């Protein structure tokens, strides 16, 4: 059995010699479990359309990642130093260039004059942290870097946001893409609409127009700014996306649901 997430099939699948090896491995697999339609598509590109593939997305603990009550939301905002009436965007990830936080910072700076209550919190660490902080300082953007967020804090950080955003983008001619984006399903489980960049499996994680928005060109500051402003301006749309996000998390990403799916696959393979 082979399990695929993203880069381990995308990169060798695009290089002639390694593609031959990958194709042989995939064709000889008793079954293939893919984390989304993106790695499944990449596998078919390398090994053919007849591969035995089942898509089982990454899971989320829907009891731990849950919507906050109004009081919990206020308390959580105060924990992170955010005012009750702020328009809060939260981004959580390993900080590397393809995650697109530089674009989010530029968007926050561009919108700040017309939206003085806008606040962006970025949680996570990584090699891009220093560059991002310099960009924040240069632009005077209403963005605060939180550094590493503990597992205990994470659900509250998502839950107190109006929108969660990670503008993931493809790099190196498509060799570097987003495999899935577990941060999107965590935010969804908290009932928070998500904004994703169109890259790899992000469109599997975020249903465009239903649980959030997928930006076609995540490096286009104007396009992203329009998307952000649209969601922040429309509280009713956000409430619809909140409900849809939570329902999808319970029905699609919950560990109990995924365990049953995996058990069915293993039962078939074991016969």
Question: Which residue ranges define each predicted feature?
Answer:
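Carbohydrate-associated surface elements
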Residues: 38, 59
């Amino acid at each position: 059995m082979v399990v695929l997430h993203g880069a381990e099939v995308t990169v060798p699948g695009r290089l002639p010699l390694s593609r031959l090896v990958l194709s042989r491995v995939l064709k000889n697999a008793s079954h293939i479990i893919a984390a989304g339609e993106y790695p499944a598509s990449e596998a078919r590109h390398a090994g053919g359309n007849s591969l035995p593939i089942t898509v089982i997305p990454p899971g989320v603990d829907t009891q731990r990642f849950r919507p906050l009550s109004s009081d919990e939301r206020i308390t959580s905002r105060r924990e992170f130093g955010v005012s009750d009436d702020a328009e809060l965007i939260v981004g959580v990830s390993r900080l590397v260039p393809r995650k697109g936080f530089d674009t989010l910072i530029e968007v926050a700076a561009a919108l700040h004059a017309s939206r003085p209550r806008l606040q962006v919190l970025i949680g996570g660490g990584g090699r891009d942290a220093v560059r991002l902080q310099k960009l924040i300082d240069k632009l005077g953007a209403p963005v605060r870097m939180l550094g590493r967020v503990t597992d205990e804090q994470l659900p509250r950080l998502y839950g107190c946001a109006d929108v969660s955003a990670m503008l993931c983008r493809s790099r190196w001619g498509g060799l570097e893409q987003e495999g899935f984006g577990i941060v999107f399903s965590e935010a969804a489980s908290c009932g928070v609409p998500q904004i994703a960049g169109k890259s790899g499996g992000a469109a599997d994680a975020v249903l465009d127009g239903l649980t959030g928005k997928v930006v076609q060109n995540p490096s286009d500051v104007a396009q992203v700014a329009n998307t952000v402003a649209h969601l922040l301006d429309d509280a009713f749309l956000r409430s619809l996306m909140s409900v849809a996000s939570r329902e999808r998390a319970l029905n699609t990403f919950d560990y109990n649901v995924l365990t049953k799916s995996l058990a069915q696959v293993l039962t078939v393979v074991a016969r």
